[in-house]
Amino acid sequence: QDKVLKNTFASLRVYEHMKDLKTIGIINDDKVKKVMDVGVPLGVITALVPSTNPTSTIIYKTLIALKAGNAIIFSPHPNAKQCSFRALEIVKKAALEAGAPEGIVDGVTLLTLEATKELMHSKDVSLILATGGEGMVRAAYASGTPTISGGPGNGPAFIERSADIKKAVSDIITSKTFDNGVI
């Protein structure tokens, strides 16, 4: 049930939040400071997919890559092969139906460490979105390709003295037990 909520959040809530955001072209033009923010697509993004949250990761990363005008190639964890390939089918179909070009969303089919390393080191890849274990995230940073990663979850919780203690404890327990504590 928690995975369903994650997929719903990764798709509907994220889409609703960003659908009207301008991400390409002139985003902001401050005439007073004479500063302009310009969004430019990076090109091809490689996305590492963990075994713990494969479907929501694929949905979310597809949305943010396409919204920013980029292509994305996924490298799923071998232990999540079936659900990752199914999620990829769904997002590829949705992208095509929305008018995206063929091949803008894809994934490697040979799920080996060597294939992932080759993808991360490719000169055609502009950015790696690394979600996964510590070793894979380190390998992404060591590849020489710019990398954005999510670190390990399960951070500590702090209850400030003015907080409603019962509510804070309830919220912490809910957050730590949601999806068995998997971020």
Question: What positions do the PLM features span?
Answer:
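A glycine-rich helix N-cap at a beta->alpha junction
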Residues: 93-108
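N-terminal Rossmann-like NAD(P)+-binding subdomain of aldehyde/semialdehyde dehydrogenases
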Residues: 1-34
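ALDH superfamily catalytic-core signature
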Residues: 67, 137-183
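Substrate-binding/gating loop at the entrance of the active-site cleft, primarily
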Residues: 27-72, 77-89
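Short glycine/serine/threonine-rich phosphate/pyrophosphate-binding segments
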Residues: 53-60, 66, 84, 130, ...
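General beta-strand structural signal in soluble alpha/beta enzymes
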Residues: 56, 74, 106-109, 129-132, ...
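Conserved acidic residues
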Residues: 43, 125-126
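A structured beta-alpha segment of the ubiquitous adenosine-cofactor-binding alpha/beta core
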Residues: 23-37, 106-125
